[in-house]
Amino acid sequence: MAVFEKVQEIIVEELGKDASEVTLESTFDDLDADSLDLFQVISEIEDAFDIQIEAENDLKTVGDLVAYVEEQAK
């Protein structure tokens, strides 16, 4: 499974969104994600990819998150 598809799956599950709403261009504001939602999404992604996502990263869109995961998973 590609990184985007797995990230999308986690966001859909954690935020209760339709997969069509979760695109690379979607911001977390667009997805109505508050800080607790984002924490849960990041926690699931860290577990799924066995990486650590630092809090100071400026991840505003799903695409930003996917790019970060791809870089860390290398």
UniProtKB/Swiss-Prot annotation:
Modified residues annotated as O-(pantetheine 4'-phosphoryl)serine in this record: 35
Keyword Nuclease: no
Record-linked Pfam families: PP-binding (PF00550)
Gene Ontology process terms (BP): lipid A biosynthetic process
Domain of life, per lineage: Bacteria
Any GO CC annotation of this UniProt entry: cytosol
Principal location: cytoplasm
Record has Hydrolase as a keyword: no
Pathway: Lipid metabolism; fatty acid biosynthesis
Carrier domain: residues covered: 1-73
PTM annotation: 4'-phosphopantetheine is transferred from CoA to a specific serine of apo-ACP by AcpS. This modification is essential for activity because fatty acids are bound in thioester linkage to the sulfhydryl of the prosthetic group.
Example of a GO MF term: acyl carrier activity
InterPro entries recorded: ACP, ACP-like_sf, PP-bd_ACP
Localization in the cell: Cytoplasm
Keywords per UniProt: Cytoplasm, Fatty acid biosynthesis, Fatty acid metabolism, Lipid biosynthesis, Lipid metabolism, Phosphopantetheine, Phosphoprotein
Function: Carrier of the growing fatty acid chain in fatty acid biosynthesis.
Protein family according to the UniProt entry: Belongs to the acyl carrier protein (ACP) family.
Protein name: Acyl carrier protein
Taxonomic source organism: Streptococcus pneumoniae serotype 4 (strain ATCC BAA-334 / TIGR4)
Lineage, uppermost ranks: Bacteria, Bacillati, Bacillota, Bacilli, Lactobacillales
Gene name linked to the record: acpP
